[in-house]
C-alpha cells in the first residue's frame, strides 16, 4: 500500500485544500485491522490525480461510493456503515490502482487523548507499574475480534499536516504492552458490555499542556484575561523542552485525523496546567468546541478524568484541589461532557497511579450510562455537598447529593481528609463520621470549637478516603471561597 506523509503549507484551513502530488493514496488512519464507527456515514479520504474517479467498496454492503479528486489533489467520500460485525474488507480503487483493506471491523471508536497518565502503557513506566498488566498482556491475543488500536506517535508540528505515520493493529501481547492502559481497559470493558468491537485511537503526549492541543484561534476565543493570555504565551520560551507551544500537537496529531468517524473523546490531562485554576475551565471548554467543530458534531461526547491526589513536591499545598474544582466547573458549562473522580486512586509518591483499570472502568461506566443509555447498576456520578450546617456545638453537618447508596471510608476505616477552620482561617485536621442515613457526614475538631469553614481532600495529598458503597470517590470540596 502506497502511503505518504505530507506537510501542509502555512495558512491552510482544516478541512480545506491540501496541496500535494498526484500519487493515489489513502490516509493512514484507514488501514487493515481498523474499526469503522458502526451505523453512521463515515468519511474516507486520501489523495490522487485531480479529476480522477475514486471508488470505495465495503464488503458489508457491496455498494460503490464514488467521488472525483479535487483540483488540489484531495478526495473524500462518505460510506454508510452497518451494524457491528466483521471481519470485512474494503476496496479503494482509482483507475487501475487498488488499495485493499482486510480484517476490518464495525463497532465503536473512541479517541484517547491527554498527557502521561493517558499515555502510560500497560507495561508501565519503568518502576511505575500498572495493576493487572500481566493478565492483560497474557490474554491480549484472545481479544483480536474485540479490540483494535491505532497509536499516534507523530512529533509536534509548527504547521498542520495532512497524514500521520501509523497503522491500525490487532492485539497481541506486545501490542497490549505498548498500548495506553486507560485506553485498553476502557475498550475491554466497553466491548464486553456492548458486545461489539471497540477501536481506540491513542493520541497522548506526556508532559503536554492543554494549549498545544488547541489552535491559536481556539485559545483566542476562550475568553481569557490579558494576564492569563500573557502566561500562556510565555511558555513558548520553553518549547524546546516540553510540548507547550499552542497548536503544536493539534497540528501533528489532531488535524490529520479530524473528522474520522468516532463516538467520542477521552481526555486525561491537567498536571502541566495545574496552576491555572482561574482559566483552565475556559481553555478546556474552548478546546472541546474546537474538536467538535472539526469532527462536525456539536455535542460529540467528551469524557475526562479529574486529577488524582499526589505529593507534587508539596503535599500540604492546595494547587491540585483548586484545579480539580476548575475541572469540575468545566463539566457544568460544557454540554455532553462528563468527569470521573479519582480522589481515592492517587499515590503519594508517584504522579502515575497504578490503578488504571478502575479509572478506565469508571470512564466506561459513564459512557455506557450517559452516551449509550445503558444502566449498569453502578451510578458513577460523584457525590457533591448540597448543604452545610454549622452547629452551636462545633459540629459541621454536610449533606450530599448523588450518593445513591451510602457514604463510607475505604475498608471501613476512619474517614480522613476533612479540615475545619475558625475565624482565624487556619485549617486543622478534623474527625468525621457518616450519619445513619448514609448521606450525611458530621465533622468536628477539638482545636476548632467554633468552625466557620469545612474542607475535604483540599491538599495535594492528604490520604482522603471517602467514597460511596459502590466505590465512587468524593472529590475535593469546600464551604468557603477564600483565596488559598
In which residue ranges do the predicted regions lie?
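Positively charged n-region of N-terminal signal peptides that target proteins for export
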Residues: 1-5
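Bacterial N-terminal signal peptides
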Residues: 7-17
